């Protein structure tokens, strides 16, 4: 792939950091919902305000792949897959094996039968956060298609793709007939697994946000000008999109009688308002972190979080597991203050783990290669 050296975009690193923070929030929120009477506002913080977190990772992944590139330049698909395999496939397999072994011991469930491993790996079911990497691998496998589309991409075509995306995601998430068909399939059949776990590997759920990241990367000078001229409007878009998703969440609970769990399973990132929020949050955060820069304490903090976000994303369930064991071992319920404290502890513990492992990896390069796909520069 031909490329020209472009200036580093610090906002992307910061977005990685805040996205990782959002993912931790979602997973702490899932545990907090075990509380028989959860605070619906804290649930909104953990599980609604963070809904941009997974889709925006696909945005920045595409941005990183296409920034400074030309989609019409010569492209070695083989070399691309080798590089991406080192960066994603190897860590995915390593962490999947780690969690299968760890959980077999920690939860006493035993190691799964060997015949079930292909299915576990295909669907990203070794641990709850790993499905993201499966979808990312599929995006990589289809890279020639994305390059072809981006070489011909226009804003009107991108708008059409957005409309198709909204329609497809709505069908996948909310179509009653389709979902009844899936749940009616016999347990243990391949077709049921392929459809039941569709959110774990169907790239079609996130094509628009991925292409948006690639399109902005290819037209970054124009996008940077737009951010400079319309920063306030981009902030407003982010706020309005969040307010709309929150309003729907509160309506579901306070008016329609949904439980908090039902509310977050409805007002999610694949709903029309969820997609609107993902777009609004993406553009607003890009503008915010571009303006924030790296010459202040907050900016530097997000750069550090972004630098270690990959390891934290992969490792944070370990911290959650043992913090929960401590909480339950002392006969405490996950109340709002404890949940917030647990969130901060998870973030700080995994940040420390990431820093230590990165340092060890500088002495033993294989550590970084296996855990985060980082090759030591000579």
Protein language model features and the residues they cover:
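Functionally critical transmembrane alpha-helices in membrane proteins and complexes, commonly lining
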Residues: 10-69, 88-96, 126, 200
């Amino acid at each position: 792939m031909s490329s020209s050296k472009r200036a580093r975009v610090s906002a992307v690193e910061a977005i990685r950091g805040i996205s990782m923070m959002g993912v931790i929030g979602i997973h702490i929120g899932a545990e907090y919902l075990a509380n028989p009477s959860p605070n619906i506002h804290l649930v909104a913080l953990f599980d609604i305000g963070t809904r941009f977190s997974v889709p925006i990772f696909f945005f920045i992944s595409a941005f990183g792949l296409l920034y400074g590139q030309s989609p019409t330049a010569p492209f070695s698909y083989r070399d691309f897959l080798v590089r991406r395999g080192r960066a994603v496939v190897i860590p995915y397999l390593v962490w999947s094996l780690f969690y299968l072994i760890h959980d077999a011991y920690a939860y006493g469930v035993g190691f799964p039968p060997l015949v079930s491993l292909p299915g576990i790996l295909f669907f990203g079911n070794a641990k709850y956060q790993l499905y993201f990497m499966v979808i990312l691998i599929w995006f990589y496998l289809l890279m020639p298609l994305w390059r072809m589309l981006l070489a011909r991409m226009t804003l009107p075509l991108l708008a059409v793709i957005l409309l198709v995306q909204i329609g497809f995601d709505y069908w996948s998430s909310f179509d009653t007939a389709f979902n009844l068909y899936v749940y009616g399939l016999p347990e243990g059949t391949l077709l049921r697994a392929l459809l039941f776990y569709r959110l774990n590997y169907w790239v079609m759920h996130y094509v628009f946000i991925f292409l948006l990241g690639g399109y902005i990367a290819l037209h970054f000078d124009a996008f940077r000008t737009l951010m400079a001229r319309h920063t306030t409007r981009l902030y407003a878009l982010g706020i309005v999109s969040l307010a709309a998703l929150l309003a729907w969440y509160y309506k579901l609970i306070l008016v329609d009688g949904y439980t908090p769990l039902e509310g977050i399973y409805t007002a999610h990132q694949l709903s029309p308002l969820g997609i609107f929020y993902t777009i609004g949050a993406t553009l607003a955060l890009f503008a915010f972190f571009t303006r924030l820069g790296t010459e202040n304490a907050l900016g530097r903090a997000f750069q550090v979080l972004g630098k270690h976000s990959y390891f934290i994303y992969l490792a944070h369930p370990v911290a959650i597991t043992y913090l929960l064991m401590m909480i339950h071992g002392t006969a405490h319920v996950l109340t709002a203050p404890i949940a917030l404290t647990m969130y901060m502890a998870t973030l700080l513990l995994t940040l420390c783990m990431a820093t230590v492992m990165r340092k060890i990896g500088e002495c033993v390069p294989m550590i970084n290669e296996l855990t985060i796909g980082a090759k030591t520069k000579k």
